[in-house]
Amino acid sequence: KCFDHRKERRIIDHIKTTLNHSTLYIYGSVQRSKHYYFTVCTEQGEVLYSFNQVIHS
């Protein structure tokens, strides 16, 4: 479930989709320096997609 993540994980964005007029939430947390773990979830807490990304500032 998406909402059972650690406390440092937070909603960083949300997307209004045309699919059933639902809302998707993007959660992000920093695992290491500049290394982020993102999760895309539905309003019901179902994880649709997750990925790691290194952010270069």
Curated annotation (Swiss-Prot):
Subcellular location(s) of the protein: Nucleus
Protein name, per record: Stress response protein
Expression tissues: Mesophyll protoplasts.
Motif range (Nuclear localization signal): 6-10
Keyword Transmembrane tagged: no
The organism of origin for this protein: Nicotiana sylvestris (Wood tobacco)
Alphabetical UniProt keywords: Nucleus
Functional summary from the UniProt entry: Stress response. May play a role in the reentering of protoplasts into the cell cycle.
GO cellular component, one term: nucleus
